[in-house]
């Protein structure tokens, strides 16, 4: 749905683990990266499924492989990266979005390693936007670094996830406040900036751009 926070236009998708089939995708059955929403939509269509909603879901290398941890249908494709490093991904604390059998949650990376939750799907990104109801300590209110951004937050009961794309440029501080203040998400994770893209059948929207790595998708069976 379309929404707004202060002067920032937003697109927000709220999903429920009770009613929505939420998944992560990276490669086709032939082992090639999907790279875009159309390729994923076509493969789903070939399997009597349809793509309801999707967005880029985690940072990736030039070959479209994930920078951090990635798990698909219980299979670990990339191990957890816990060391600090360059760029937004390495701005600790970073985190992992995890899809369980009947729950959804954003974990701080070391918390994830400590608890070892049983995730059907998982994707690591960074930085954390909100951690235990607090904004990331390195975010600056007056920062001039503004980009189109997207991310995910989860509800306290782990039944809902909020996927948000800012349609206007925004700094980290304000983007994190959207999850904390507007959506009341105790934990939220940044996905990306410049390449942020979204697919929504309901909104008749299919953003085009450079090839992407991990893709978050809400999938439905064909009627």
Descriptions of predicted regions:
Residues 27-32, 111-115, 165-169:
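Short, solvent-exposed aromatic-acidic interface loops
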């Amino acid at each position: 749905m379309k929404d707004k926070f202060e002067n920032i236009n937003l697109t927000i998708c709220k999903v429920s683990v009770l009613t929505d089939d939420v998944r992560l995708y990276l490669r086709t059955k032939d082992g090639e990266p999907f790279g875009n929403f159309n390729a994923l939509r076509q493969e789903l269509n070939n399997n009597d499924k349809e793509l309801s909603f999707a967005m880029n879901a985690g940072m990736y290398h030039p070959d479209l492989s994930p920078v951090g941890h990635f798990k698909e249908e219980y299979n670990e494709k990339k191990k957890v990266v816990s060391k600090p490093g360059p760029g937004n991904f390495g701005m600790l604390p970073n985190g992992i979005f995890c899809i369980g059998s009947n729950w959804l949650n954003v974990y701080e990376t070391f918390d994830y390693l400590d608890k070892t939750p049983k995730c059907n799907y998982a994707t690591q990104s960074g930085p954390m936007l909100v951690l235990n109801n607090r904004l990331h300590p390195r975010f600056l209110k007056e920062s001039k670094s503004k980009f189109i951004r997207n991310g995910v937050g989860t509800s306290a009961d782990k039944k809902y996830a909020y996927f948000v794309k800012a349609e206007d440029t925004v700094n980290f501080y304000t983007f994190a406040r959207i999850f904390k203040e507007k959506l009341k998400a105790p934990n939220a994770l940044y996905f990306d900036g410049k390449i942020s893209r979204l697919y929504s059948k309901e909104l008749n929207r299919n953003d085009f751009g450079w090839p992407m790595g991990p893709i978050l998708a809400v999938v439905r069976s064909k009627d």
